């Protein structure tokens, strides 16, 4: 695409907003912030990319990101894959039962859902319960060994928020609010995002 963070920044400094506004490179950037950390001036290029994405008409933004954002808005679970509250709970129970049956050392393993007063509220990326449910149990084991007081919630468990990557502030806020309100209703003190834990 002939673009990189340095060129992007140069276009912004030169006031060539028209060349930035519609350039597809902003959708190739992962907003990982490495360029910001490498920048000797500490310029937040990721924030600039976010604002450049925001200039695109919503219906012209990448369909995969747009679809995932809209899916999370359509269900109270917050899942970008559309996994319902009941399906999420079923997957947890199924994996928990399998672990207890096949791994006797883990017969006491717990994966609480909607546990009132738990200290930690744990969100979950939809990919695991949807495609790789066996990837959920290792974290449960770590939390069990550490004696952590935690819970999932049926409402707002979806930890991925594609609305942020879409640069859709209102939708981002709505998905986030759903999750945080769920954590608050349960009386949890700390929100843990699954992607940050492991």
Where are these regions (language model features)?
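Iron-sulfur-cluster electron-transfer modules
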Residues: 9-194
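Conserved small/polar residues in nucleotide/adenosyl-binding loops
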Residues: 197
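A broadly conserved sequence feature marking short terminus-proximal activation segments
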Residues: 1-8
């Amino acid at each position: 695409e002939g673009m990189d963070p340095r060129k992007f920044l140069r276009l912004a400094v030169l006031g060539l907003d028209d060349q930035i506004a519609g350039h597809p490179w902003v959708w190739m950037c992962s907003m990982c912030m490495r360029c910001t950390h490498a920048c000797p001036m500490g310029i937040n290029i990721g924030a600039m990319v976010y604002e450049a994405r925001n200039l695109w008409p919503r219906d012209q933004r990448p369909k995969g990101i747009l679809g995932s954002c809209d899916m999370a808005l359509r269900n109270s679970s917050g899942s970008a894959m559309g996994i319902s509250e009941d399906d999420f709970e079923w997957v947890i129970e199924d994996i928990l039962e399998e672990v207890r049956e096949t791994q006797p050392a883990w017969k006491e393993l717990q994966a609480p859902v909607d546990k009132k007063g738990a200290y930690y509220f744990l969100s979950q990326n939809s990919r695991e319960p949807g495609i790789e449910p066996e990837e959920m149990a290792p974290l449960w084991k770590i939390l069990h060994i550490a004696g952590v007081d935690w819970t999932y919630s049926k409402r707002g468990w979806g930890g991925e928020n594609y609305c942020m990557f879409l640069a859709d502030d209102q939708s981002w806020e709505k998905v986030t609010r759903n999750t945080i309100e769920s954590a608050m209703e349960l009386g949890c003190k700390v929100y843990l995002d699954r992607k940050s834990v492991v």
